[in-house]
Amino acid sequence: MILQVLLLVLGFLMLVKGADWFVDGASGIAERFGIPQLVVGLTIVAMGTSMPEAAVSINSALKGNAGITIGNIVGSNILNILIILGITAVITTVAVQKSTIWIEIPYMMIITVLLLVLGKSGNQITLSEGVILWVAFLLYLGYLFYCAKKNKEEVVEEEAKPMWKLLLATILGLLLVVWGSDVTVDAAKAIARGLGISERVIGLTVVALGTSLPELFTSVSAARKGKADIAIGNIVGSNIFNILFVVGTAALIVPVEFLPGFGIDTVIALGAGLLLWVCIWRKRALTRPAGIVMLIAYLAYFCVSDVVFL
């Protein structure tokens, strides 16, 4: 068991470092080709911080570990909102753009409902339903590029890294994420079997926390640097990416089982999104008291879930 825990930690470290290298390399390459920084931030960075969830969930789907696939995504989305934004808000007040309140967060909640409906309709996400999620993902990308074009900012010239270094970082980062996901899934499955608990619980808690580390580091770092407004955009973007791209891609490869307990967990994820919206819609900011409320909400969710009955 000790070996499996060490392997799980190693897998998490590989995921975090791999995602970091991928984001740096891919962002640098995109900027070298003149792609606006806003587009890079809204797409590559948000997707890059979600790479651990993507790799672990798709890998677990291929290995037939349904509990880890959906559990990781739903658990990560709950944790991203309540824990990561909660911690960030406790550190500093988080400013929120108007479009985030009225477009992006509502869209996140709509696709959460879509995931629930698709999952409960046949207790699995099928190929055709994966296509639906991908269409919704492409619509979201179209919206992002529209916003980028509308709000294009002047790019500040900086000393560029050699192209070979950017390519090397991108390739090594991607390989490290893929390898780390394999180590993480195998270790998590072994721990679940050893402790006699379900893969769903492992996916919702331990794996969700580990794969959310990039979002946590990005948001807390932004808050400390006085750029807390980046935090909500990163989290909301990552949550949308998790549902539409990750689950959608996994379903295109193999039908993804939607276990009965995931219905409640998905409703909790929807509730977390609604709580976030309620906390920010008046002042267009996420304050410290709101952050504390969100942390308490996650603690309550954790306590009333079947985790306490393990």
Feature map (PLM): residue ranges:
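Hydrophobic alpha-helical segments, chiefly the membrane-spanning helices
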Residues: 1-310
